[in-house]
Amino acid sequence: MTMLHLQNLFSFNTRVPINKLFFENNTHFSSNFSYKIRSNNISHLTLGIDHGIDSSSSNFIKALSDHQGDVLAKNEIGIIDFFEAKNLLVTGATGFLAKVLIEKILRTTPKINKIYLLIRAKDKEAAFDRLTSEIIESKLFKCLKEIHGESYESFIRSKLIPVVGNIDEPNLGMDCIISQQIAQEIDLIIDSAANTTFDLRYDLALDAHVNGAYQLMMFAKKCINLKLLIHYSTAYANGEREGLQYEKPFIMGESITKEKLTSHSPSAKFPLLNAANELDFVSKLKNSIKNNDEFNKIIKELGDERAKLYGWHDTYSFTKAMGEMVIDSMRENIPIVIIRPSIITSSYEQPFPGWIQGLRIIDPAIVFYGKGEFPGVYTNPYCLIDMVGGVPVDMVVNATMAAIAKHGNLQSPELNVYHVASSYVNPLLSSQISNYCYEFFSSFPFVNSKGDQVKVQKMKYFDNMLDYSNYISKELLNRHHEVEDSKMQKLFKRKVEFLKNCSKVYEPYTFYKGWFHNGNMQKLMEDMSEEERKSFDIDLSKINWRDYIIGIHIPGVKENVLKGRM
């Protein structure tokens, strides 16, 4: 599951909370403007028009999206029928993606039996409290509440069972008796647990994504009625591969570096990547270094070093790929579906347009830009980008439910991979995102604490980090040179450091040289009936990115994350 939070993303030393760095001035949206959500009848976006793209780039991009063609489903998967009377276990249950999945299952397949929700909590009471505050009372569930009226709470509590647990512990951290009961009952496991910080400490990332995958498979083997296990990974698990990336599983021992070496020299030798060895290596390192500060520094750098050695961009994508390897190596006869979304963004249509939980990936940059604090960006303007125009969360959920029904009915002991990403069927350039942000904030500007509307400028692009850093420093410090308060001056300097670190962390993605084939998604869509394609829409080719970003995504961030203020 590809869901990326702002908290703890950067390692530079500051005690100032991020909200104080950028939200200090109480900037808010101008009340003199309103915006309209786009209609459901949207046209396909043809790239290369009115965006300053040369003809060769235009022809190349258009060729990628023209393959989609007409989809004429002759049969149906039977999505709604499959979920009837089923029992599920969902890990990472209070996360962005899992909550949208739970809402959709309850709303469209109300005859499901039980959904056990693995929740991190100190005890059962705390888990119930999180269920109430983060799910039952969430705005996300308002449509379900309208459907059931006064019986809403009794309905949802009869279906959702909170369970105290932790993905990286034996029996997933569950009480022994409860884990035995669940192992006897469940038909499906949906693994949505992950730590989505790109530069997370290596030991913590290994625990979450590698040891977590191991513990998950150990528990799955105890589930006597298990029909399918669904694991959320990320399309960026493809690492430093370039060009078109197909939906291939990772095999233990493989690495991107080894692929590149053997493609040029078949006899070349390179160490095999083994997840167990990585866990053992970090464990021994931890025991040998007694000074916590020294260990924290070494382990932080180690994750990036190991990732780059084997051909991945960062600790996150590296450990997610190893997690896939663990699942494949342990699966035996368990049917597995691995869902690899790119970047998951706000809802496109269901349960309503624009719902999002937290600032994700490029959202902080969008907000900073609207506030006049992000005058330039470190990126290739012609990079095919899955970071905002990645994939709306409801389409990831729809693909998940369709894949569950398809492979749950087949129950074939295979591992199937689905790329849920837009770069192949409906590509978006980073320059287009900037243009759409400029268009939005020119029409719907923020208002600063003095009551003045913030005027944004066209984004400048940089392909050299030194030039970009110098530009950011000069621009931001010049804008705040009149501030004499030493504390505020320090705050502005920290803003500069924050943006530099932000750009450095995202550099592999803003200059990414690959795009993600989704042939299995296409086959899934062909298997669906016309009614299923309407109710469980997975057609990413039809999204008009301008309408989505201007009419849905940015307003959704404003309403659901910023709560109408900065």
PLM region spans:
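N-terminal Rossmann/SDR dinucleotide-binding element
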Residues: 4-25, 32-197, 201-206, 214, ...
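Amphipathic terminal alpha-helices
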Residues: 40-53, 59-62, 66-69, 112-116, ...
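Hydrophobic/aromatic anchor residues within beta-strands of the central parallel beta-sheet
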Residues: 162, 229, 336, 472-474
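Hydrophobic structural elements of the Rossmann-like NAD(P)H-binding subdomain
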Residues: 230, 339-340, 420
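NAD(P)-dependent short-chain dehydrogenase/reductase
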Residues: 241-317, 321-410, 424, 433-441, ...
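Mid/C-terminal beta-alpha module of Rossmann-like enzyme folds, strongest
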Residues: 403-505, 510-517, 523-541, 560-566
